[in-house]
């Protein structure tokens, strides 16, 4: 018994080391990304509440597309991670190329569709918003949607690098891109007085730079990955099948899940500009609170994928359990720090007292419920790394459509609780999904999933 405890202790020591080494660069990256995003929102806030509302509305659309490609990138990340786990570098590089080319092709198609129907989409979703808000939203969407292929390239390449265990390179690229974003946005908004056009141009130029840099990194070659023979390419369905077996369910989950979030945004638009602006501000503050959780989600997918590639199912389970606990403790710590300043934070975005008061109340609720977030998001991120993407998809959709949307509408609209009611529906969704993911994790059936042909455990 003592010997088993010693072995278990040694194993956990290596797990902690792997998690910390992989997570710290992601954490630094997330901190910088969210901070720069908050600065951008603050700068837009000084254009006017109409600009904040327009950006919040358009970002709810952009986030659906970005989340779709982030989810598709998970397929490439998991497959590359599992090949790296097997030390099969040739297959890892081939999978990277397949994931990149196929995703860019899909992104170009989506960009063309969105550009053709952009005005109709805004009118359909947010027709009840003020005319000035809709006009600003049309300008912002027209510019930002042209960057979808660049975002896709950035997400796929950085995701694959993380899957290979390299989190420092994506961190450096993302930090540089976000610094440029703030510089461009400040120049266009505060110096050149371009208004909402400046906000859109700033983010578009920064994304272009980020995509170019990460592509150059892979063309030059990292420690294990290198993109070669760009003109020589044909689809390899033996590699695309495992990539899309993870990526497609994850993308469907993301599309329908974020589509549900968009529906809740439509509820909020009907509540008026104060609620729209408060929702955008609270989302921005919530993103800052949730930095540790988001970083550990990425680490969970990569590390579980690598262990499953080596057929180390127990190590995968121990790693995911440790990451989930670490995330929960980190989020509780963030919430405790934030609560005393919940009234001050919204003042960084606006001077409108009505928006400040509503934002403060929703932020307090967010901080109280955030400890539940880990079992709702970190656990399924690890399950996807093992290939259990279909279960996470179905569970997420149940939570979103039965609780966040239906209950959010009932609380927010029928019971007239407004924005607080809509967000309360989201917190109940977190709770239900978290319980379902926890049951799945404890049962252990996810360990039987096979994405690529496994090697014997070493």
Language-model segment annotations:
Residues 11-42, 46-47, 63-75, 107-111, ...:
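N-terminal transmembrane alpha-helices
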Residues 21-37, 143, 206-210, 214, ...:
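Transmembrane helical elements of multi-pass membrane transporters/channels
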